[in-house]
Swiss-Prot record:
Keywords: Amino-acid biosynthesis, Arginine biosynthesis, Cytoplasm, NADP, Oxidoreductase. Pathway: Amino-acid biosynthesis; L-arginine biosynthesis; N(2)-acetyl-L-ornithine from L-glutamate: step 3/4. GO terms for cellular component: cytoplasm. PANTHER family: N-ACETYL-GAMMA-GLUTAMYL-PHOSPHATE REDUCTASE, CHLOROPLASTIC-RELATED, N-ACETYL-GAMMA-GLUTAMYL-PHOSPHATE REDUCTASE, CHLOROPLASTIC-RELATED-RELATED. The gene is argC. One of its GO terms (biological process) is L-arginine biosynthetic process. This is N-acetyl-gamma-glutamyl-phosphate reductase. Belongs to the NAGSA dehydrogenase family. Type 1 subfamily. It comes from Methanothermobacter thermautotrophicus (strain ATCC 29096 / DSM 1053 / JCM 10044 / NBRC 100330 / Delta H). SMART domains: Semialdhyde_dh (SM00859).
């Protein structure tokens, strides 16, 4: 049994961490922080969590006593918190973008923030970095879009049969966070599909960085906001470097992800409702046209495999628990 703290527990990702950890047999949540809701029972902010006696606390990184802390804080805030935790010997899974990049220059260019406290971190996509995650003190949890996009493209890059991708992702409104904006205001996003940051989304270099660890790639990425609460459906287009048929591509994906506990290669086209609420990524389609354009589709829940579930998966690996502990349940179809 380990003790866990959550810094920034009042948002959607913090709430998902609390929900998922309620049934984790190896974890006790000892601290859930929130400046806004200090002293307020967790169940008032997260009404589905009625079985917890936790109250939000307004405590700093120097006051939390835990074996591991999840930092579910905005970009730019984590870099001010994480070094204090690491210095005290507390292992960290950071859900912000502050530690995802190999160099601070890329972070500063795409996030527009000067990085004040660079640290060595392991990028927390278990399907690539499982061994490094196991011994890491700091794991940088991947972004939601990169998780779905990387998993959709990875086998083709590994096999050197594709090196250029056009990636289109449709995301639910919860990906924008708990604070409403003009973009996510109901009258604007309902009955609408909204492309945004069409050529300059900050998850683009994150996707490129991780795929290029295997082989150099070129890619374009465009996200769209759609009027659903949860989920990311990613469609990756690529022109194959070899002549392959649909069945051959499916075989490559099935072989590559064989044994992966949370990646499911499926027949047909994945759907958001099949993975909603779960830590699974479904990958399918694998269609090829007469120009050797291959189309791969992946589906994840942006709050689970795209955030909090993957963070717990990383924690499980770090502490030698069963990787599926607390996460081994299906989605909530329909």
């Amino acid at each position: 049994m380990i003790s866990v703290g959550i810094i920034g527990a009042s948002g959607y990702t913090g709430g998902e961490l609390l929900r998922l950890l309620e049934n984790h047999r190896e974890v006790e949540v000892v601290s859930a922080t929130s400046r806004q809701y200090s002293g307020v029972p967790v169940s008032r902010v997260h009404p589905h969590l009625q079985d917890t006696d936790l109250k939000f606390e307004d405590v700093g990184a120097g006051e939390i006593d835990a074996d591991l802390v999840f930092t579910a804080t905005p970009h730019g805030a984590s870099m001010k918190i994480v070094p204090q935790l690491i210095e005290r010997g507390i292992r960290v899974v950071d859900l912000s973008g502050d530690y995802r990049f190999d160099d601070t220059e890329t972070y500063e260019e795409w996030y527009g923030i000067k990085h004040e406290s660079p640290l060595e971190a392991v990028y927390g996509l278990p399907e690539i970095h499982r061994e490094e995650i196991a011994s890491a003190d700091l794991v940088a949890n991947p972004g939601c879009f990169p998780t779905g996009a990387i998993l959709a493209c990875l086998p083709l890059v590994y096999e050197k049969i594709a090196d250029t991708f056009i990636i289109d992702s449709k995301t639910g409104v919860s990906g924008a966070g708990v604070k409403p904006t003009a973009l996510t205001h109901y009258p604007h996003c309902s009955d609408n599909v909204i492309p945004y940051n069409v050529t300059g989304h900050r998850h683009t270099p994150e996707i490129r960085q991780e795929l290029s660890r295997l082989n150099p790639v070129r890619l374009s990425f465009t996200p769209h906001l759609v009027p659903v609460t949860r989920g990311i459906l990613t469609t990756a287009h690529t022109f194959l470097l070899e002549d392959l048929e649909q069945g051959e591509i499916a075989d490559i994906f099935m072989g590559f992800y064989d044994g992966e506990p949370f990646v499911r290669v499926v027949e047909g086209i994945p759907g958001l409702s099949a993975v909603r609420g779960s830590n699974f990524c479904q990958i399918g389609c694998f269609e090829v046209d007469d120009n050797q354009r291959a189309v791969i589709v992946s589906a994840i829940d942006n709050l689970v495999k795209g955030a909090s579930g993957q963070a717990i998966q990383n924690m499980n690996i770090m502490f030698g628990f069963r990787e599926v502990e607390g996460l081994d349940f299906p989605g909530m179809y329909p």
